[in-house]
């Protein structure tokens, strides 16, 4: 007997939510480490010159974490992603866009290349950086799959 599966094999929406929560946890660890070692955000484009804590609270974030306002937006989008229908889709799309922003932020940050250089390698900092890169990639992947699944479900329901 052949039955139609209503649930996809991969629950991409839940994967996106869990990955986003882990990204927030990693941002918290990164913030504590950056404040302890005074690693403010330094990019070729935007540099405030503020200490790490002040940069986290009011600037571009630290070398190891996004700014506070992006963490708050991430939390709000996670809560939205739990909702059904279009509010949930707003959360999913928003988290996917944040994944892209976080990934770009890691590659623009000059500290990323410094800590991954064998001469200036710093294990705790490198772990936070690599974890954020992996989590941002997962946020993008889960987000795209969740959007495609939602569109497919919406099209099937319209038939």
Predicted feature residues:
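Cytosolic juxtamembrane helix and N-cap/initiation of the first transmembrane helix
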Residues: 1-36, 145-155
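Membrane-interface helix-boundary signature
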Residues: 5-19, 84-91, 121-128
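Helical transmembrane-bundle signal
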Residues: 19-34, 74-77, 95, 99-109, ...
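Hydrophobic transmembrane helix segments
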Residues: 21-68
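Interfacial non-cytosolic loop connecting adjacent transmembrane helices
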Residues: 42-61, 107-131
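Hydrophobic alpha-helical transmembrane segments
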Residues: 57-73, 130-141
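Juxtamembrane helix-break-helix junctions at the cytosolic face
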Residues: 73-96, 149-151
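Alpha-helical transmembrane segments of multi-pass integral membrane proteins
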Residues: 110-159
């Amino acid at each position: 007997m052949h039955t139609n599966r209503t649930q996809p094999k991969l629950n991409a929406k839940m994967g996106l939510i869990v990955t986003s929560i882990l990204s927030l946890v990693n941002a918290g660890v990164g913030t504590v480490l950056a404040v302890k070692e005074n690693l403010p955000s330094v990019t070729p484009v935007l540099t405030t010159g503020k200490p790490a804590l002040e940069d986290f609270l009011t600037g571009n974030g630290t070398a190891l974490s996004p700014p506070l306002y992006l963490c708050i937006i991430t939390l709000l989008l996670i809560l939205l992603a739990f909702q059904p229908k279009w509010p949930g889709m707003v959360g999913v799309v928003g988290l996917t866009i944040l994944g892209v922003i976080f990934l770009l932020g890691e590659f623009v940050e000059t500290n990323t290349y410094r800590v991954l250089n064998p001469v200036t390698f710093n294990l705790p900092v490198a772990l936070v950086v690599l974890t954020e890169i992996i989590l941002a990639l997962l946020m993008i992947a889960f987000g795209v799959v969740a959007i495609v699944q939602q569109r497919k479900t919406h099209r099937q329901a319209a038939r």
